[in-house]
Regions:
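Active-site entrance/lid segments in N-terminal catalytic domains of soluble metabolic enzymes
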Residues: 1, 6-16, 20-21, 25, ...
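Glycine-rich beta-to-alpha transition loops that act as phosphate-gripper elements at the mouths
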Residues: 41-44, 291-293, 333-346
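Glycine-rich phosphate-binding active-site loops on the catalytic face of alpha/beta enzymes
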Residues: 58-72, 229-231, 348-378
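C-terminal helical cap(s) of enzyme catalytic domains, especially alpha/beta-barrels
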Residues: 72-92, 363-391
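Short beta-strand/loop segments at the ligand-binding rim of alpha/beta enzyme cores
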Residues: 32-38, 282-285, 327-337, 446
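Catalytic cores of alpha/beta
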Residues: 48-54, 211-215, 327, 340-359
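Ferredoxin-type iron-sulfur electron-transfer modules and their immediate structural context
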Residues: 370, 374-375, 380-460
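Generic long, charged, amphipathic alpha-helical segments
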Residues: 309-331
Length: 460
C-alpha cells in the first residue's frame, strides 16, 4: 500500500482519494462517523484489501460480509459460478462469506488495523472516523454455534485475539516505514471493533425466529441491532404492478415468497417490542431496507433456478418499504438503507433521514470503488443528525422513482459490454473503451500518461 501510494498516488488502483471534512462528522451507536455511506455486505467487504480500497475511495460505514455456521468449501460448493451479473439491473446467486469464519474475522481485523493507519498516514480523516457493522445469519442455532459466537465476541473486543496482537506487533515493528503514523498511534488503536449488528435471515424465516435472534443479540450480546427486511413486505400485487409499470415486466416471480416471508402485520408488533427492549438498554434499534429480491432465472442469466435482484429495479421496491415503515412508525423507526442506492438517489435518501446507506450494485459497475468518491463528495454538507424520518419526503421518493430515467427500464436495451475474446485468467478485465475503439487505441494508458504529465508519451 505504502509503495503503491508513493509511486502512483493510488491504493489498490483507486485513483482518487476521499478526504473527510473533520468539521462535518456525524455520530451513530455512540461513535464518530465521517460520512454515512459505504459498501454493503457482499463482494466488496469480504477481504481486508476490499475494505482498504473502499475507505480510500470514500466509504466510512462498512457492512461486513455475512458470516454463518456454514462456511469454507462446504459453502462454496453450494454456490454456482458465476454468481453475479450486473449489466443493467443486477442479479446474484451468492450467499455469505466463502471463507471460514475465523478467516473472515482475520480479514476484518486486518482491515480495521489498516484503515486506522492509512487514515492518518495519507491524511484521509480521523483514525476513529469510520465504523464496521457485523452481518450475521441465518438462524439462532447457527448464531449460537461456537465459531459464530467466538466471531461475535472477538469482533466486540478483539484486544486479546491473536490476529489483533499480531497486526499491532507487525505495525510497531515497521513503524519506521511511516511518515506520520507513530508508535503511540498504533498503540491507541481500539480493539472494540463492532458494537452494531445487522441480522440477515433466509427467505421464509418465521417471525418468531427473527425476534429470538434479535432478542439474543440485544439482551445477551449488547449489540445495537438492525433487522434486514425483505421487499416482499409490500405484497405481490404492489410489487408486480410496480415492476410492470416501470418496464420490468420480463422479470419473473410468483407469490410464493410473498406468502412465505415475514408478513407486514406480524412485522409491526415485533418491531415495536424490539424498540422497547432496546430503549430499556440504551441501545439503538432499526431495520435494514432491504434484502435482495428473489426472482426466477428465465434467460440463463446465472447457472441457478432462482436468483436475487438488486440495483436500479430494486430501488422502487426498497424505497416503498422504507416509506411504508416511516409512515406507520411516525418516522421514529431508524432505517439503514441498501436497495439500489446510487449517485442519483442517495442525496434524497439521506435528506429524508434514512442512513447509513450501503451499496453493492453500483460499485459492481465500471468505475467500481472510485464511484464512492463521487458519492461521498455529494454529502459534503453539515454532518447529518438523526432526528427521525420524514415520511413526506419518502413518499416523494417513491413517486419520483416510478418515472425516473435512472430507474425505469430503457426502451432500447443497453449494448453489451462483454467481448467475444478469451480474457486472461489473472487481471482479466479488458477496458471496453479500448475494444470498442475502431483502431483499438490504448485509451487507459493514454489517460494515465496525461494524468502523470507525460504528454509526449501519451501522443506516441
Amino acid at each position: 500500500i505504502l509503495a503503491e501510494h508513493k509511486a502512483t498516488g493510488q491504493v489498490f488502483g483507486i485513483q482518487k482519494a476521499y478526504v473527510a471534512d473533520l468539521e462535518k462528522t456525524t455520530e451513530i451507536f455512540g461513535r464518530k462517523l465521517e460520512n454515512p455511506v459505504g459498501p454493503a455486505a457482499g463482494p466488496h467487504t469480504q477481504l481486508a484489501q476490499n475494505l482498504v480500497a473502499a475507505y480510500y475511495a470514500g466509504a466510512r460505514f462498512f457492512e461486513l460480509k455475512t458470516v454463518q455456521k456454514m462456511d469454507g468449501p462446504e459453502l462454496s460448493a453450494c454456490i454456482p459460478k458465476p454468481c453475479i451479473v450486473a449489466e443493467d439491473e443486477a442479479y446474484n446467486c451468492e450467499w455469505s462469506t466463502e471463507l471460514y469464519v475465523p478467516q473472515a474475522m482475520e480479514e476484518y481485523i486486518k482491515g480495521w488495523m489498516a484503515l486506522h493507519v492509512i487514515s492518518k498516514e495519507f491524511g484521509l480523516g480521523s483514525m476513529d472516523g469510520f465504523q464496521f457493522n457485523i452481518s450475521v445469519g441465518y438462524d439462532l442455532a447457527g448464531i449460537k454455534s461456537e465459531k459464530v459466537d467466538t466471531f461475535l465476541n472477538t469482533m466486540q473486543h478483539a484486544q486479546d485475539s491473536e490476529i489483533f496482537k499480531h497486526c499491532k506487533a507487525y505495525l510497531l515493528e515497521h513503524v519506521d516505514l511511516f511518515e506520520k503514523v507513530t508508535a503511540e498511534d498504533i498503540e491507541s488503536i481500539s480493539g472494540d471493533i463492532c458494537n452494531s449488528v445487522t441480522i440477515s435471515t433466509l427467505h421464509g424465516c418465521p417471525p418468531e425466529e427473527i425476534e429470538k435472534i434479535a432478542m439474543y443479540l440485544i439482551t445477551e450480546k449488547g449489540f445495537h441491532t438492525f433487522i434486514k427486511c425483505n421487499p416482499t413486505l409490500l405484497g405481490y400485487e404492489y410489487a408486480r404492478k410496480t415492476m410492470d409499470d416501470m418496464g420490468y415486466d420480463y422479470i419473473a416471480f410468483g407469490d410464493f415468497h410473498f406468502k412465505d416471508d415475514l408478513q407486514y402485520e406480524d412485522a409491526v408488533p415485533m418491531l415495536n417490542r424490539l424498540i422497547a427492549v432496546c430503549q430499556e438498554r440504551n441501545l439503538e434499534f432499526g431495520v435494514k431496507i432491504t434484502n435482495t429480491f428473489p426472482v426466477d432465472v428465465k434467460q440463463n442469466e446465472l447457472p441457478s433456478e432462482e436468483m436475487y435482484m438488486s440495483g436500479k429495479s430494486l430501488y422502487p421496491l426498497s424505497i416503498s418499504v422504507a416509506n411504508m415503515l416511516a409512515r406507520d412508525f411516525g418516522g421514529k423507526l431508524r432505517i439503514s438503507y441498501s436497495g439500489g442506492a446510487d449517485f442519483h438517489n442517495i442525496e434524497g435518501i439521506i435528506d429524508a433521514g434514512i442512513w447509513p446507506v450501503t451499496m453493492a450494485t453500483t460499485i459492481l459497475k465500471p468505475g467500481g470503488y472510485d464511484r464512492l468518491c463521487q458519492i461521498a463528495g455529494l454529502l459534503e454538507k453539515e454532518g447529518v443528525v438523526f432526528t427521525g424520518i420524514d415520511a413526506a419526503k419518502t413518499e416523494k421518493l417513491v413517486e419520483e422513482a416510478k418515472t425516473s430515467p435512472y430507474h425505469v427500464k430503457a426502451v432500447k436495451p443497453l449494448p453489451s459490454r462483454k467481448i467475444n475474446k478469451q480474457v486472461p485468467l489473472i487481471d482479466c478485465f479488458i477496458a471496453p473503451c479500448k475494444e470498442g475503439c475502431p483502431i483499438h487505441q490504448d485509451i487507459t494508458t493514454y489517460l494515465q500518461l496525461v494524468e502523470a504529465g507525460k504528454y509526449e508519451e501519451a501522443m506516441d
